Structures are given as C-alpha cells and as structure tokens.
C-alpha cells in the first residue's frame, strides 16, 4: 500500500499548480493589449525566486520528488510571466525590472546555490536552504494581508477575490497535512501560516459579502443636482415676482423699460430661465387681450432692440432670447 503522504502530495501538486496558473488570464490580457497596464511585476519575481529555491531544496531532500515537481512547474510558469512582462513593460519599468531580476533571480539564487554546494554539507545544507525557503514563503503568504485591511476599511470584498482566498486556504491546509506526514517543518510552518490567513480571509468574505457598498461615487453628482434644482427654483421665483411687478406698473400707466434677462447662474438652468423670459411685444399682446374691453391702452417708451426691430420688419415674434448654445 502506498504511503498516504504521496496521495496528499499529489493533491497538493494539483492545487499549487492551479494557483501558479491563475495569472494566465492576466497575461493573456497583457499580450492582447500589448501593455502591462497597472499590473505589478514584483510578485512574479519573488515567486520565481521562491519556487527556484524550493526546487533546489527538494533535490537535496530524501523523498522530495513531489516538492521538485510542484515547484519546478511553478518556477517554469513564473519565468514565462516575468519574460512576458519584460516584453510589454514600458521602457523605464523594463530597465528597473531587469536590474531586480538580475540581482534576485540570478545573483541571489546563484549565491545561495554556490554557498550551499561549496561551504555546506549534509543536514546543515538542508537546514539553511529550508530556512530561506520558509522565510520567503511566509513573506508571500503575508502579502494578502493588505487586501484584508482594505476589506475591513471599505467593508467590501471587491478587492479580495473569493477564489484566491479559497485556494490559499486549501493549498496551505493540504501542504500542512503533508508536512506532518513527512515531518518536514520547513514546509509545515509557512503553510500553516498560509492556512490560517486563508481561513481569516474566508471569514472576512462571509462577514462582508452581503454588505452594500456605501454610496460614495455618485455623492458629488447628487449634491450638484440638488444645488441646481434649488437655484432653478430660486431663479424661477425671482423672475415670476419681477413679472408681477411689471404687470402692476403697466396697470398704473407707468412706462416700462424691460431689462434683458440676466445671464444664468448655472449652465444647466439656461432653458429654465428662457421659459420665464418674455419680450415687450409678447407682454403688450397679453395686456391688450386683458384690457380689450377698455377704451385705453398703454404706451411703451422702450427703445427697441434688435429682436423688436426684426419683429416689426418681419411680422414674427421670437419665443425666447437665444443663449450661446442656441445660436447657429
């Protein structure tokens, strides 16, 4: 009968490779758009270093075949991601990224391998490399804590995808069980931390997944609409009162010189103000109908403007004073 650790390791391989393959959709988008957009490149560089060191660790650990297969596959995928990012990154980003890749994935990795092979032997070599691998893995598992802080602050799981949290939980749990079966604490400690963080993320997801996002994006627009409506009501009321005063003056036989409508206080109120504006000719027509039974009429002592001259010449009456947007 096969060792249970082998079956657990196979399951861990499948889950881990799925996690490593998750950025494929991101890089398909990068290739199609020929741009790295706002995607970060540092996680792929650090993951490439981590998987490379774990592969080296598995090669020197007795019975470490499953460690080699999963991390070797991960290192190959991460190398492809780094290469694609370099191909489509902007010139400044590319120059900076090349320096980091050469320093971390070439220089640091080569230094660790050289020291381990030349200066360290047996159990000491395995211990030193195992500590480095565990430290890198803990750092990678701690990275999603920023997303957890964002969830708590915004009370929204928008920035913490469920699938990523679930696979973090599952991957950490499976490899923690594997570490107990093979008694490898360099694998167990970082994956136990990953399992705990994955559990915490799932708990946050369950707590905030039904929470509605606070209305914040449309707040400024709503305030502008309310302000515009208030100004519209105020302007309409003022124009109506002004017309009432004109009617009273006309009834008393006073001469009236109508001012031109004032420029609108708000761009969106142009049509509203136009609807309340009347020309002297229209007002005279209305008053003539109102006082049709009387034997007197009122004389306008106003100086005709361009519109009045046009009416007198052409026999038509403009409905409103044209604003800047209505002239052709």
Swiss-Prot record:
InterPro entries reported for this sequence: SWEET, SWEET_rpt
Domain of life of the native organism: Eukaryota
Bias-annotated ranges (Basic residues): 288-299
Stretches assigned to the Extracellular side: 1-5, 57-63, 121-125, 183-185
UniProt topology in membrane: Multi-pass membrane protein
Subcellular location as annotated: Cell membrane
Any one of the GO BP annotations: carbohydrate transport
Topological domain spans for side Cytoplasmic: 27-38, 85-99, 147-161, 207-328
Sequence ranges assigned to domain MtN3/slv in this UniProt record: 6-92, 127-213
Record's keyword terms, sorted: Cell membrane, Membrane, Repeat, Sugar transport, Transmembrane, Transmembrane helix, Transport
Biased composition (Low complexity): 312-328
Cellular component terms per the entry's GO annotation: membrane; plasma membrane
Pfam families registered for this protein in UniProt: MtN3_slv
Keyword Transmembrane helix: yes
Segments traversing the membrane: 6-26, 39-56, 64-84, 100-120, 126-146, 162-182, 186-206
A GO MF term: sugar transmembrane transporter activity
Assembly behavior: Forms homooligomers and/or heterooligomers.
Homology family: Belongs to the SWEET sugar transporter family.
Purpose: Mediates both low-affinity uptake and efflux of sugar across the plasma membrane.
Protein name per its UniProtKB record: Bidirectional sugar transporter SWEET16
Annotated gene: SWEET16
């Amino acid at each position: 009968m096969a060792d249970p650790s082998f079956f657990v390791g196979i399951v861990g391989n499948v889950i881990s490779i799925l996690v490593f393959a998750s950025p494929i959709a991101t890089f398909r988008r990068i290739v199609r758009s020929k741009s790295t957009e706002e995607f970060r490149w540092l996680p792929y560089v650090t993951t490439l270093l981590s998987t490379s060191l774990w592969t080296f660790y598995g090669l020197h650990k007795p019975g470490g075949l499953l460690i080699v297969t999963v991390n070797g596959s991960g290192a190959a995928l991460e190398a492809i991601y780094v290469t694609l990012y370099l191909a489509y990154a902007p010139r400044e980003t590319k120059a900076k990224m090349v320096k980091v890749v050469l320093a971390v994935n070439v220089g640091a990795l080569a230094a660790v391998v050289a020291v381990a092979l030349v200066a360290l032997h047996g159990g000491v070599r395995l211990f030193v490399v195992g500590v480095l691998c565990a430290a890198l893995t803990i750092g990678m598992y701690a990275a999603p804590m920023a997303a957890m802080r964002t969830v708590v602050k915004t009370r929204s799981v928008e920035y913490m995808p469920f699938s990523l949290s679930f696979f973090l939980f599952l991957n950490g749990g499976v490899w923690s069980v594997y570490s107990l079966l093979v008694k490898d604490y360099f694998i167990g400690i970082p994956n136990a931390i990953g399992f705990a963080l994955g559990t915490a993320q799932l708990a946050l997801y369950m707590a905030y997944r039904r929470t509605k996002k606070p209305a914040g994006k449309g707040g400024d627009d709503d305030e502008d609409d309310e302000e515009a409506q208030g100004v519209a009501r105020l302007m309409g009321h003022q124009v109506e009162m002004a017309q009432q005063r004109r009617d009273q003056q006309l009834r008393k036989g006073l001469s009236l010189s109508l001012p031109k409508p004032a420029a609108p206080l708000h761009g969106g109120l142009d049509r509203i103000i136009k609807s309340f504006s009347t020309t002297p000719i229209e007002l005279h027509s209305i008053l003539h109908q109102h006082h049709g039974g009387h034997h007197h009429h009122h004389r306008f002592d106003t100086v005709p403007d361009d519109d009045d001259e046009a009416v007198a010449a052409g026999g038509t009456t403009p409905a409103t004073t044209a604003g800047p947007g209505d002239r052709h």
